[in-house]
């Protein structure tokens, strides 16, 4: 929280694992949360800091800024009474570095050792108010107004007075940015800036889980809004008057769309109740892989909905079912392997359970039709995209695989083109199939990717780019074609299909527009058909898949 100062010099604690005298639970959680029920998120924060090797904790009571004052004012308006005692805001800041001399904390806690911070609001509520009895029976409320930490990583001294960060294996947080925070009192402060995702909690009285999920996305994803989004702003957009309105069942999809429309955001939406045959994980994954956050609405139980922010994914290249499901039941699982099959978790921020938690896709896949049971089922998803992008990548991927299959029907490969021959063989065997991985990219990114690539046969980099590609639209959906073993072992591919990320219109209906593509040794023609000879292409082997550089960083992969 930038520009928000402490009332006094920070309290400094040694919190290193194994150090006598400090417990995250008894010394941090219990005194602040006491009888409050919403402590799952702070437990997650402390567990994350413990695993990342936190050695020093700073605790400060803050001078309230406008946002903090608004939170307390709205709470008082909601309960309709003066709060029994003065509410407070506490900031916790975590460092991987030890602090041997507490008077010199600004010198001894380097920027590279900063793991993250959390601002917690505390308020005592009058227990004779019905809504307080229902929602906060103890009268003691505490919740995270704002937090930002590094994604899960190993943080260690690098020997040069700084700290090195190595991301957790196969753990990708695609949506992140830098968050500046000011630690210390006025005149004796220092600024730190972790790079990660924004986190916050609902308080259940003036804002709910949808507020939290929206704020986590809007305050993290770059290019969506030009200011920090607060709970009061969202309530004002919806015309919520805390003296009259209480969102006891959360916000509706229509209210969420009212907010996105008011902020002039470009979104893609999917209704998995109306279209239960659309696999929600296959719909979400290309957006997340592209760096676009997704708001996911689901039912933990039949009668209750919940909203979370999807910011990344983990990958398990050893998953058994990715190939086995097609091998054993090809009639039930389609004609190709969506790369989403190797996603073993979506990385989500859940205001109930904390930041960077891992939700397995299978948790929200129900075999019962939605009209009979909504329990543990994805209901609705909203992806937040750059302006003008209106083609769902889910459909771009299906169309791209259709083009490859269409080409297979009219073209026999040259006997020397072994990799194209291998693709055709996989396509011809229902129990084998090919892999499709779809993500968004700009034309500039894609051209740079090709020009920097040498294939497994030693061909490349590609110096002559197709004229079609030079004149391509700026925003594209890229579907990469691979084989299961090649994708999981090498993270390599054997071809690309590019689709315009903006839908053309024909008779008022959106249309997918094929731009260009290649497979080993050839360029894929528009509308492959008998008698059409594909143009040659210099790459005949496999090349690395395209990565979004912002999520790679120093990390381990398997």
Q: Locations of the language-model features?
A:
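Noncatalytic regulatory segments and standalone regulatory/sensor domains
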Residues: 1-173, 315-558
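Generic detector of well-ordered alpha-helical segments enriched in charged/polar residues
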Residues: 46, 69, 73-76, 235, ...
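Glycine- and small hydrophobic-enriched segments that form the cores of compact globular domains
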Residues: 174-270
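Residue-level signal for functionally critical sites in structured catalytic/ligand-binding pockets
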Residues: 179-186, 203-204, 306, 329-332, ...
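Short loop/turn segments at secondary-structure transitions that flank enzyme active sites
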Residues: 215, 220, 302, 314-316, ...
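Active-site-adjacent substructure of cysteine-protease-like catalytic cores
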Residues: 257-339, 346, 556-558
């Amino acid at each position: 929280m930038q520009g928000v100062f402490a009332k006094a010099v920070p309290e400094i604690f040694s919190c290193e694992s194994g150090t006598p005298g400090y417990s995250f639970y008894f010394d941090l959680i219990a005194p602040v949360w006491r009888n409050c029920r919403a402590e799952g998120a702070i437990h997650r924060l402390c567990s994350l800091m413990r695993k990342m090797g936190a050695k020093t904790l700073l605790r400060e009571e803050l001078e309230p800024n406008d946002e903090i004052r608004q939170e307390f004012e709205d709470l008082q308006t909601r309960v309709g009474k003066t709060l029994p005692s003065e509410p407070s805001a506490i900031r916790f800041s975590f460092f991987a570095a030890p602090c041997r001399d507490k008077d010199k904390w600004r010198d001894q806690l380097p920027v590279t050792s900063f793991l993250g911070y959390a601002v917690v609001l505390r308020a005592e509520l009058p227990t004779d108010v019905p809504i307080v009895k229902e929602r906060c029976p103890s009268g003691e409320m505490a919740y995270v107004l704002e937090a930002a930490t590094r994604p899960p990583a190993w943080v260690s001294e690098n020997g040069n007075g700084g700290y090195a960060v190595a991301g957790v294996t196969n753990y990708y947080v695609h949506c992140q940015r830098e968050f500046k925070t000011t630690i210390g009192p006025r005149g004796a402060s220092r600024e730190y800036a972790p790079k990660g995702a924004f986190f916050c909690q609902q308080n259940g009285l003036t804002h709910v889980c949808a507020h939290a999920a929206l704020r986590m996305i809007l305050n993290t994803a770059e290019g969506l809004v030009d200011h920090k989004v607060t709970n009061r702003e969202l309530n004002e957009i919806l015309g919520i008057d805390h003296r009259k309105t209480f969102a006891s069942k959360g916000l509706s999809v229509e209210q969420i769309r009212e907010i996105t429309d008011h902020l002039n955001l470009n979104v893609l939406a999917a209704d998995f109740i109306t279209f239960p045959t659309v696999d929600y994980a296959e719909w979400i994954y290309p957006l997340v892989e592209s760096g676009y956050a997704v708001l996911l609405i689901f039912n933990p139980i039949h009668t209750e909905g919940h909203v979370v922010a999807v910011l990344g994914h983990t990958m398990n290249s050893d998953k058994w079912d990715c190939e086995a499901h097609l091998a054993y039941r090809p009639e039930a699982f389609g004609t190709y392997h969506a790369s989403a099959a190797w996603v073993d978790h979506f990385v989500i921020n859940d205001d109930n359970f904390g930041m960077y938690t891992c939700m397995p896709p299978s948790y929200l896949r129900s075999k019962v039709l939605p009209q009979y049971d909504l329990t543990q089922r994805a209901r609705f998803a909203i992806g937040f995209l750059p302006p003008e992008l209106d083609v769902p990548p889910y459909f771009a991927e299906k169309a791209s695989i259709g083009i490859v299959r269409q080409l297979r029907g009219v073209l026999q490969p040259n006997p020397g083109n072994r990799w194209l021959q291998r693709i055709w063989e996989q396509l011809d065997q229902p129990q084998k199939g090919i892999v499709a991985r779809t993500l968004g990219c700009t034309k500039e990114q894609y051209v740079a990717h090709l020009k920097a690539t040498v294939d497994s046969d030693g061909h490349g980099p590609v110096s002559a780019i197709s004229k079609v590609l030079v004149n391509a639209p700026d925003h594209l959906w890229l579907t990469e074609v691979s084989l299961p073993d090649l994708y999981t072992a090498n993270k390599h591919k054997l071809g690309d299909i590019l689709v315009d990320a903006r839908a053309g219109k024909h008779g008022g209906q959106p249309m997918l527009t094929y731009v260009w593509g290649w497979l080993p040794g050839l360029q894929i023609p528009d509308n492959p058909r008998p008698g059409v000879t594909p143009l040659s292409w210099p790459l005949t082997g496999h090349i690395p898949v395209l990565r979004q550089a912002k999520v790679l960083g120093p990390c381990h992969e398997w």
